[in-house]
Amino acid sequence: MSEHTRKSFSDLGISPWLIDTLKALAIYEPTDIQEGVIAQILEGRNCIGGAKTGSGKTAAFALPIIEKWSKDPSGIFALILTPTRELAIQIDEQFAALGANLNLKHALIVGGMDMIRQSIDLSKRPHVVVATPGRLADLIRSNGEETIAGLRRIKFLVMDEADRLLSPTFADDLDDCFSVLPASEDRQTLLFTATVTDAIRQLKYQPQKNNKPPLWLYEVETDNISVPSTLQQSYIFVSSQVREAYLVHLLTIPENAKKSAIIFVNRTRTAELIYSILRLLELRVTELHSEMVQRERINSLGRFRAEAAKILVATDVASRGLDIPSVQLVINFDLPRDPDDYIHRVGRTARAGRSGESISIVTERDVDLVHAIEDRVGTKLSEYEHVSENKMLEYIKEVTDAKRQASLEMIDRGFGERRQKRNEKRLMANGISNKLKNSGRKKKAKNTLSTEK
């Protein structure tokens, strides 16, 4: 069997001037996902691309979009939707880098930033808009036609991390976003994800309108997303009452004290609490979760990348897609409900052939989750042997005191009030939107009845 000869960017249809930009960014040949989809996108096909984090997915859609935009540089050419602010920022940065020599105008539309400024940016018709569904939906609901008119003529819709965007969480916001876009037959739609679900695969069989070529589905290793072979996976079984004390014990034993680590939790309140406890205990820690404003999140990631903080406490916002360097240790303070989320979390370590370690803190309520994870990864987690109950008990008092103080600080700061206000604002906006929709339906029904008479 002959070895596969990798195609060049030129073979895929990328112009010399854009190849020169790639070389300036030290990108010399396409990755598997880029090789698999770029030519098909340039041919005008709708596309689903599946590849793991760090495989070059963003350039796989950014390059053909810029290539086609250069031949027709008008209006809002492409809308890229992604589930988190951090992913949106990274995509926006890649478009900025790839389009730097072309006067490509791009706008970032995400929460945590000035909404009026974003409305103005959108009304200026940038060539590429990178957005989270919630903030774009807010702008659509609260602004007039002048602001959103450019979205009605886009040539490309990209949904990055499509498996998450197509979950019920984003359904209402996506409905509002899609309501101002061209019909599917009048644009190219590109879906990219690290996990190609059966529901996404079924989209391949939907008939294409306006004589469009069949949808192109290309997967790289996504049917077997797996943990790295160099990863050591273990667990400690503890009472739920002493999880925080065991966590501090884990972080401070000689084997782990100097390691860079990400601690994953399931809720923003837990992330804030654990971060505050570790900060009060004078560990070099930072945090990342959706309750932080954008400036705080960027600063926090910067501290972790620069190793000013050795520990990052995070929700699953940090498990996929973010430009975070490989760490030496991943700790699951909370086990995820979905075993695939476990794989994405522990995939933050043992990258590029390096060794790494993951430790899951398991309580009496987590046994079924552990079994599901073991079935998914195809191996048993080993028991972590470097902690002891006697040593953990030495931390109980100071951890309990720190937890009490951290809880009081969160109450004093009104932690969670920002989300509550945002939800109230969104409910109000949805109420107005629904009234307008219902009004439109009644008017349409009335007109229909009038016609029938």
Curated annotation (Swiss-Prot):
<dbReference type="GO" id="GO:0005524">
    <property type="term" value="F:ATP binding"/>
</dbReference>
<dbReference type="GO" id="GO:0016887">
    <property type="term" value="F:ATP hydrolysis activity"/>
</dbReference>
<dbReference type="InterPro" id="IPR001650">
    <property type="entry name" value="Helicase_C-like"/>
</dbReference>
<feature type="domain" description="Helicase ATP-binding">
    <location>
        <begin position="38"/>
        <end position="214"/>
    </location>
</feature>
<dbReference type="InterPro" id="IPR011545">
    <property type="entry name" value="DEAD/DEAH_box_helicase_dom"/>
</dbReference>
<dbReference type="GO" id="GO:0003724">
    <property type="term" value="F:RNA helicase activity"/>
</dbReference>
<dbReference type="Pfam" id="PF00271">
    <property type="entry name" value="Helicase_C"/>
</dbReference>
<keyword id="KW-0378">Hydrolase</keyword>
<keyword id="KW-0547">Nucleotide-binding</keyword>
<feature type="binding site">
    <location>
        <begin position="51"/>
        <end position="58"/>
    </location>
    <ligand>
        <name>ATP</name>
    </ligand>
</feature>
<dbReference type="GO" id="GO:0005634">
    <property type="term" value="C:nucleus"/>
</dbReference>
<protein>
    <recommendedName>
        <fullName>ATP-dependent RNA helicase dbp8</fullName>
        <ecNumber>3.6.4.13</ecNumber>
    </recommendedName>
</protein>
<comment type="function">
    <text>ATP-binding RNA helicase involved in 40S ribosomal subunit biogenesis and is required for the normal formation of 18S rRNAs through pre-rRNA processing at A0, A1 and A2 sites. Required for vegetative growth.</text>
</comment>
<feature type="region of interest" description="Disordered">
    <location>
        <begin position="413"/>
        <end position="453"/>
    </location>
</feature>
<keyword id="KW-0347">Helicase</keyword>
<dbReference type="Pfam" id="PF00270">
    <property type="entry name" value="DEAD"/>
</dbReference>
<keyword id="KW-0067">ATP-binding</keyword>
<dbReference type="InterPro" id="IPR000629">
    <property type="entry name" value="RNA-helicase_DEAD-box_CS"/>
</dbReference>
<keyword id="KW-0690">Ribosome biogenesis</keyword>
<feature type="short sequence motif" description="DEAD box">
    <location>
        <begin position="160"/>
        <end position="163"/>
    </location>
</feature>
<dbReference type="GO" id="GO:0006364">
    <property type="term" value="P:rRNA processing"/>
</dbReference>
<dbReference type="GO" id="GO:0005730">
    <property type="term" value="C:nucleolus"/>
</dbReference>
<keyword id="KW-0694">RNA-binding</keyword>
<dbReference type="GO" id="GO:0003723">
    <property type="term" value="F:RNA binding"/>
</dbReference>
<comment type="similarity">
    <text>Belongs to the DEAD box helicase family. DDX49/DBP8 subfamily.</text>
</comment>
<dbReference type="InterPro" id="IPR050079">
    <property type="entry name" value="DEAD_box_RNA_helicase"/>
</dbReference>
<keyword id="KW-0539">Nucleus</keyword>
<dbReference type="InterPro" id="IPR014001">
    <property type="entry name" value="Helicase_ATP-bd"/>
</dbReference>
<keyword id="KW-0698">rRNA processing</keyword>
<dbReference type="InterPro" id="IPR014014">
    <property type="entry name" value="RNA_helicase_DEAD_Q_motif"/>
</dbReference>
<feature type="short sequence motif" description="Q motif">
    <location>
        <begin position="7"/>
        <end position="35"/>
    </location>
</feature>
<feature type="domain" description="Helicase C-terminal">
    <location>
        <begin position="230"/>
        <end position="393"/>
    </location>
</feature>
<dbReference type="InterPro" id="IPR027417">
    <property type="entry name" value="P-loop_NTPase"/>
</dbReference>
